[in-house]
Regions:
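Bacterial Sec-dependent N-terminal signal peptides
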Residues: 1-20
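Specific register positions within alpha-helical solenoid repeats of the TPR/Sel1-like families, i.e.
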Residues: 21-34, 63, 67-70, 105
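Helix-turn-helix repeat elements of alpha-solenoid scaffolds
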Residues: 28-42, 72-80, 113-114
């Protein structure tokens, strides 16, 4: 009985232990196809929400996948709340601003979630040079796309 419990516990832990690098890679390819969007959504559904950055990526996954899911309004609202909640917790985190910027820039204009585009661009521009190299390169790749 203890072995069964231990197996399920470790299985659950391993499934939820996605690295931030894996999440970033999935996020950058999510807009390429419906399959990639669904893959990113599924990845974030299984990810432990142990950081504000992961919360924001989960919010982005909900917003990206909302059209495919048939729960457009609900998922857009929930995704926005996760992104805004993450930024509220860590307002100086540049990656959170990049996530919100990328979401707001790519949502259809009919969706009323576009108020922070200029604010986030300026924040990123002002703080990018101070970031560690891997994060700096990741954000530069988004900006230069």
């Amino acid at each position: 009985m203890l072995r069964v419990f231990l197996f399920f516990f470790l299985s659950t832990f391993c499934i939820q232990a996605q690295s931030i690098e894996e999440i970033r890679k999935a996020y950058t390819t999510a807009s390429e196809s419906k399959e990639q969007k669904e893959r990113f959504y599924q990845l974030m559904q299984g990810a432990a929400m142990d950081t504000s950055v992961k919360e924001a990526y989960k919010g982005a996954s909900l917003m990206m996948y909302s059209k495919q899911s048939g729960k457009l309004r609900t998922m857009l609202k929930e995704g926005k709340a996760l992104i805004e909640g993450a930024i509220e917790k860590e307002p100086q985190n540049i990656e959170l601003h990049m996530i919100r910027l990328s979401v707001q820039e790519h949502l259809p204009k009919i969706v009323p979630y576009r108020a922070n585009i200029e604010e986030d661009r300026k924040f990123i521009q002002d703080h990018l040079s101070q970031q560690p190299q891997p994060l700096k390169k990741y954000i530069e790749n988004y900006i230069n796309d």
